[in-house]
Curated annotation (Swiss-Prot):
EC number: 1.2.1.8
Subunit structure: Dimer of dimers.
Origin organism lineage: Bacteria, Pseudomonadati, Pseudomonadota, Gammaproteobacteria, Pseudomonadales
Catalytic activity: betaine aldehyde + NAD(+) + H2O = glycine betaine + NADH + 2 H(+); betaine aldehyde + NADP(+) + H2O = glycine betaine + NADPH + 2 H(+)
Organism, as annotated: Pseudomonas aeruginosa (strain ATCC 15692 / DSM 22644 / CIP 104116 / JCM 14847 / LMG 12228 / 1C / PRS 101 / PAO1)
Xref: SUPFAM superfamilies: ALDH-like
Protein name as it appears in the record: NAD/NADP-dependent betaine aldehyde dehydrogenase
Binding, K(+) 1: 26-27, 93, 180
Residue sites binding NADPH per the record: 150-153, 176-179, 209, 230-233, 286, 387
Keywords from the UniProt entry: Metal-binding, NAD, Oxidation, Oxidoreductase, Potassium
Gene3D superfamilies in UniProt: Aldehyde Dehydrogenase, Chain A, domain 1, Aldehyde Dehydrogenase, Chain A, domain 2
Cofactor descriptive note: Binds 2 potassium ions per subunit.
Pathway assignment: Amine and polyamine biosynthesis; betaine biosynthesis via choline pathway; betaine from betaine aldehyde: step 1/1
Amino acid sequence: MARFEEQKLYIGGRYVEASSGATFETINPANGEVLAKVQRASREDVERAVQSAVEGQKVWAAMTAMQRSRILRRAVDILRERNDELAALETLDTGKPLAETRSVDIVTGADVLEYYAGLVPAIEGEQIPLRETSFVYTRREPLGVVAGIGAWNYPVQIALWKSAPALAAGNAMIFKPSEVTPLTALKLAEIYTEAGVPDGVFNVLTGSGREVGQWLTEHPLIEKISFTGGTSTGKKVMASASSSSLKEVTMELGGKSPLIIFPDADLDRAADIAVMANFFSSGQVCTNGTRVFIHRSQQARFEAKVLERVQRIRLGDPQDENTNFGPLVSFPHMESVLGYIESGKAQKARLLCGGERVTDGAFGKGAYVAPTVFTDCRDDMTIVREEIFGPVMSILVYDDEDEAIRRANDTEYGLAAGVVTQDLARAHRAIHRLEAGICWINTWGESPAEMPVGGYKQSGVGRENGLTTLAHYTRIKSVQVELGDYASVF
């Protein structure tokens, strides 16, 4: 018996039945409980959502900037009023501790929406003088209908990161949440409607990426795809978006981010950063600093400090306010992470702690994996090369700065990087050489609304958040005006 009623699609400002008649289940990873049956959208449903978005976008774009701004600001207020309710639902669906979802997921998503709500009236063109009798002006116009495809690790936050700039710029969005964690995106659709967003401007279609995601990516009336997920899937989405109708794309993809701890670093601070960069949200964060480079002279002291902090991790029931480490998001993902851990053991990385599924008592019903630290890792190990997306830290030893930078950059990814040092010149010198789109000095993990987020290399295309993102949800129209005579050559 599912905890919640069957979840429908959200099209045109209301819940509607999927025409497919098919459903899938969403599971609480803490105990295997079926939370709800969720309806699976068909190609016909995608078409309904697109047509609804086309009509809704016309109404939305015709509003004044101040009208749109006020409506989005009202949605921010509702999000904050319902923070605890949404956090509780997010915890059930993702397995994240309630202490985390209450303080991070909805809070940071609402911050992004508030940021873009304030920027709506600032979307403007420019005037370019040509000569006394002629000038050019530009208009920033919405793209039209755009699609967002979300990942399972930050469901409502990602939905807000994608919809906030899209709606602020006057677009309509069709959002497809991950099949694994679909519930809070539907609640966000309710909130937008309650705030006054016109029907059709934010639709939610649930289903698989192979079907619903592909149909959205191919649709000729969709002007842009914003995707968060794995690199291999991102490449397919990008290829389909280009071949179908030359859609614009934003891709926030995988990472294998380096954290370099220099010999002069405060090791207590470095250990705090390393543990947060690997075990917050049970290691399911795309920017995690999973390759931890420590100078040979500091290895033993650093490892001891890391182990001391791992002992403070409170693995438990996500509903318990004292828990700060929950299960992985699903049982299939747990098996994937355990497979990587076995690979690390087989390739002779030295296991400092963890390395197994947690099955004591009630934990045996959930997708729990112990915080795991490997050391004496080599650059060619699978756990060092590939994104694991779980609570697995790899410690690597280096001898000098040039070596650390070279090895840190020796990856197909370039999402994030960080350094810990008390030498300001060294910090900036190293950061300027690191090939990553998001970098931190003496900290890790914060991604405020004002900060553009995105990767180098195979970690993505484009950016989310910040001023630059708003521009990518508009297109520029250039208009020349001639006030004088027109000179024809004929």
